[in-house]
């Protein structure tokens, strides 16, 4: 029994020895590598960081291998630092890597902050891409040292296995770009331009093809800015222009059938006792009783080619602002018709002259009884009581065509359907004399020439007012509280060769004396239509735009009389105000001003546009929440709501847009706009 036990123990020892012999023999030396020798195949392999043997697929665990690796590599300075997380924590973490962990702050400091897609910021993304492409090439020294170490310790059949970290870059893990990278090797310096060129292009909006981001921004500002519901859109006003040549001015009110009295008008529209009210009165040479024209409206029934027609219209948004007028002696019955326009405002009196009882003229009436709904406010400007004009009322009408001349002794017949009741006894056909050849409709001469108020060279001659709310070939002498805005379209179309007509304005009383607004009533006579066609042919030769630059032909007037009245003259030049400090930079601005020749004529507004449509849109919506003051010389200034003082040239934009580009002088409301301008401009 003892013999049997000894035999079994001997067999177990033999099997144990055999197992140990067939197993892998581990050789641990003071070198940098651990070599496992396979007893079956005699194929040594270098194992780093406890990897499995690739030649035979058997796993071998050695206790303390990582510690031996770390100790040997740290002691030998000639060894190549192969990737191991424990080693990298101590040797390859540089201050630049630590700073990269704070890449959001770095990106903001370099001006790339604020732009992101989701949780990925543009600054960190671009910085990572640039650094990765710059360090995408593996250093040649690392490859050479690793191959030399491998060849010194292994044979031709040996394999070298290198383990790379499998975690994302962090404090404990070095970033990828410090070693091997699979990023494409392209020029990282051209990355930003290529990115902008690839993505910031080919926009499409409203059926328009917008090639660049600037074009998209301009289109958005011109077409997609929300406007006030009180804004008049002139394109929505219909106009009858086919065949019907009988033009009539009807006294109607489409919104109410009740008669308006003077007391209701004063109670609804007068805010304080100091506010002045205006009236429109019609006088006849045969009677002394004054009758008022109730809610004038012009049926737009003449051809587009007719050069002289009294036209008035109103957008539905302005129905609440209908001009209400009271009969002073006799009542006028209300008839159905179109909605009257609020543009016929201010002090206007239709009277007939002694020379010709059929001549219709509109003159100033300082003491009037017509009240307007929310159209005039009075402010104390520099100690004087002046009228403030809302911009919504100023930029209402427009026209593109040059004015027309009417020859001497031209008379147009009008039938009973004309609807102009100058007196209750007037029901017969009337001949309306259109005045002499000296009574011409004035057109402002140049761009910054704001001759709004005009008087005739011959004050005895009285002409009637012409109003055209559409983009027709008629002269736009549109008045909003006695303010003519046709100068804006004249600046666009260029100067014309008409005689100047001046007006006298008293800023202390707010009264305006209009003696020369020339117009005609188009009749249905075919003979008159032929004559109008002849007039159009004559005027086409006269209304030729000058080739000179509008900015070089700006006129100004500095003289004033002792009683506070200022007379505007077209023979003076207004200097162009420079808004940049450096004269050298001003040359740059002058060179680029040709690209945007259309400038807003309001003093204190620096808006310029490349085309006419941009200025038209700005006229309607650019000064929505501002008040404009009419200066004695006929210009407009933006009123400061805080101090009720008018802004000087450039002062309004400096307050609303405090951030200014020092090179070109452009101003922006916030700093982001200025940053975008600096990043995308050529200067």
UniProtKB/Swiss-Prot annotation:
PROSITE patterns: ZINC_FINGER_C2H2_1 (PS00028), ZINC_FINGER_C2H2_2 (PS50157)
Protein keywords: Amyloid, Cytoplasm, DNA-binding, Metal-binding, Nucleus, Phosphoprotein, Prion, Repeat, Stress response, Transcription, Transcription regulation, Zinc, Zinc-finger
Entry coiled-coil feature ranges: none
Region of interest (Disordered), residue spans: 156-178, 305-324, 332-357, 399-420, 498-517, 535-573
MF annotations from Gene Ontology: DNA binding; DNA-binding transcription factor activity, RNA polymerase II-specific; zinc ion binding
Zinc finger (C2H2-type): 598-623, 659-683
Biased amino acid composition, Acidic residues: 535-557
Cellular compartments annotated: Cytoplasm; Nucleus
Extent of Polar residues compositional bias: 160-173, 558-573
Region (Prion domain (PrD)): 230-458
GO biological process assignments: positive regulation of ribosomal protein gene transcription by RNA polymerase II; positive regulation of transcription by RNA polymerase II; regulation of cell size
Mod. after translation: Phosphorylated by TORC1 kinase at multiple sites. Phosphorylation regulates nuclear localization and RP promoter binding.
Entry GO terms, CC: cytoplasm; nucleus
Subcellular location, principal: cytoplasm
Function: Transcription factor that regulates ribosomal protein (RP) and ribosome biogenesis (Ribi) gene expression in response to nutrients and stress. Promotes RP gene expression under optimal growth conditions. Leaves the nucleus upon environmental challenges, resulting in a down-regulation of RP gene transcription. The effect of the environmental cues on SFP1 localization is mediated through the TOR pathway. Also regulates the expression of genes involved in the G2/M transition during the mitotic cell cycle and the DNA-damage response. Required for carbon-source modulation of cell size.
Entry's free-text remark on domains: The prion domain (PrD) is a Gln/Asn (Q/N)-rich domain, which is unstructured in its native, soluble form, and which forms a parallel in-register beta-sheet in its amyloid form.
Summary of subunit composition and partner proteins: Interacts with the target of rapamycin complex 1 (TORC1) in a rapamycin-dependent manner. Interacts with MRS6.
Other noteworthy facts: [ISP+] is the prion form of SFP1. [ISP+] is the result of a conformational change of the cellular SFP1 protein that becomes self-propagating and infectious. This conformational change generates a form of SFP1 that assembles into amyloid fibrils. [ISP+]-aggregates accumulate in the nucleus, and results in significantly larger cell size and increased drug resistance. [ISP+] can be cured by GdnHCl. It is speculated that prion properties of transcription factors may generate an optimized phenotypic heterogeneity that buffers yeast populations against diverse environmental insults. Present with 259 molecules/cell in log phase SD medium.
Name listed for the protein in its UniProt record: Transcription factor SFP1
Organism: Saccharomyces cerevisiae (strain ATCC 204508 / S288c)
The gene coding this protein: SFP1
């Amino acid at each position: 029994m003892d013999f049997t036990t000894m035999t079994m123990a001997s067999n177990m020892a033999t099997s144990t020895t055999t197992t140990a012999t067939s197993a892998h023999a581990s050789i641990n030396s003071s070198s940098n590598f651990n070599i496992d020798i396979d007893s079956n195949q005699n194929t040594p392999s270098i194992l780093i960081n406890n990897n499995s043997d690739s030649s035979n697929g058997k796993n071998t665990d050695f206790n303390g291998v990582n510690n031996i690796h770390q100790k040997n590599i740290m002691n030998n300075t000639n060894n190549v630092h192969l990737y191991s997380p424990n080693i990298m924590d101590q040797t390859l973490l540089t201050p630049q890597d630590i700073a990269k962990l704070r890449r959001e702050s770095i990106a903001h400091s370099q001006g790339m902050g604020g732009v992101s897609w989701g949780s990925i910021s543009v600054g960190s993304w671009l910085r990572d891409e640039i650094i990765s492409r710059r360090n995408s090439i593996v250093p040649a020294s690392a490859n050479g040292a690793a191959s030399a170490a491998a060849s010194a310790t292994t044979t031709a059949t040996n394999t070298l296995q290198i383990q790379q970290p499998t975690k994302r870059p962090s404090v404990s893990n070095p970033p990828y770009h410090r070693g091997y990278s699979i990023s494409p090797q392209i020029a990282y310096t051209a990355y930003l331009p290529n990115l902008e060129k690839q993505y910031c292009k080919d926009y499409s909006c409203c059926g328009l093809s917008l090639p660049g981001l600037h074009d998209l921004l301009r289109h958005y500002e011109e077409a997609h800015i929300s406007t006030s519901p009180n804004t008049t859109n002139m394109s929505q006003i219909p106009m009858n222009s086919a065949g019907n040549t009988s033009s009539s001015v009807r006294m109607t009110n489409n919104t109410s059938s009740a008669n308006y009295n003077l007391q209701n008008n004063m109670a609804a529209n007068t805010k304080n006792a100091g506010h002045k009210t205006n009236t429109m009165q019609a006088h006849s040479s045969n009677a002394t009783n004054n009758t008022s024209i109730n809610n004038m409206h012009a049926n737009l029934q003449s051809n587009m080619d007719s050069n002289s027609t009294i036209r008035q219209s109103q957008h539905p948004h302005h129905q609440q602002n209908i001009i209400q007028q009271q009969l002073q002696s006799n009542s006028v019955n209300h008839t159905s018709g179109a909605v009257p326009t609020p543009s016929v405002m201010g002090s206007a009196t239709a009277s007939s002259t002694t020379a010709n009882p059929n001549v219709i003229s509109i003159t100033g009436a300082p003491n009037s009884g017509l009240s307007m709904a929310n159209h005039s406010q009075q402010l104390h400007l520099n100690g004087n009581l002046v009228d403030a004009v809302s911009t919504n009322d100023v930029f209402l009408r427009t026209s593109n065509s040059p004015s027309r001349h009417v020859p001497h002794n031209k008379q147009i017949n009008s039938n009973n359907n004309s609807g102009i009741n100058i007196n209750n006894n007037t029901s017969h056909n009337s001949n309306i004399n259109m005045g002499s050849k000296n009574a011409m409709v004035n057109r402002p001469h140049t761009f910054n020439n704001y001759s709004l108020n005009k008087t005739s060279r011959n004050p005895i001659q009285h002409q009637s007012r012409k109003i055209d709310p559409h983009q027709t070939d008629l002269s736009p002498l549109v008045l909003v509280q006695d303010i003519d805005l046709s100068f804006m379209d004249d600046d666009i179309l260029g100067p014309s060769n008409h005689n100047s007509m001046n007006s006298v304005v008293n800023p202390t009383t707010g009264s305006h004396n209009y003696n020369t607004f020339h117009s005609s009533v188009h009749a249905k006579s075919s003979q008159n239509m032929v004559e109008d066609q002849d007039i159009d042919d004559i005027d086409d030769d006269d209304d030729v735009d000058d080739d000179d630059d509008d900015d070089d032909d700006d006129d100004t007037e500095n003289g004033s009389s002792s009683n506070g009245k200022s007379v505007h003259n077209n023979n003076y030049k207004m200097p162009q105000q420079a808004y940049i400090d450096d004269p050298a930079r001003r040359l740059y601005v002058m060179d680029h001003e040709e690209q945007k020749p259309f400038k807003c004529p309001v003093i204190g507004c620096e808006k310029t546009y490349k085309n006419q449509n941009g200025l038209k849109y700005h006229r309607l919506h650019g000064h929505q929440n501002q008040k404009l003051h009419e200066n004695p010389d006929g210009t407009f200034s933006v009123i400061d709501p805080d101090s009720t003082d008018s802004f000087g040239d450039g002062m309004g934009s400096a307050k609303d847009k405090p951030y200014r580009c020092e090179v070109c002088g452009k101003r922006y409301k916030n700093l982001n706009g200025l940053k975008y301008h600096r990043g995308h401009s050529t200067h």
